[in-house]
Amino acid sequence: MLTATGIRAVIGKGGMDQATLDAMKQYGCVYLAIVGGCSAVYTPAAKLVDDYWPELMPVDNQRLKFELNEFGPLFVAMDANGNSVYAQCIDNAQKNRPAIYQTLGIKE
């Protein structure tokens, strides 16, 4: 998709897999994460321009094109250097889990 469209930024709320992160690094694309609970802020700033493949259901499989005006707040969750805050969070949780379990008296 990145090579066919030339997309430089994707907006979402949950990240993408490692293969997509690798492709984003290769083509200089970033993943911008929306902040949960801000739909009242985001909605007025987005105007639907096109609906690609509207027959695809569920809606999360559709590809929509929006015109954005003063759209935010956003943060770079996956960058064009191959870094991912999602992967970092998982790594930190796994690294700290033994100590947390020990503190709470939970056996692994």
Protein language model annotation of sequence segments:
Residues 1-71:
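Feature captures the catalytic cores and cofactor-binding loops of soluble hydro-lyases/lyases
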Residues 44-108:
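C-terminal binding/interaction regions
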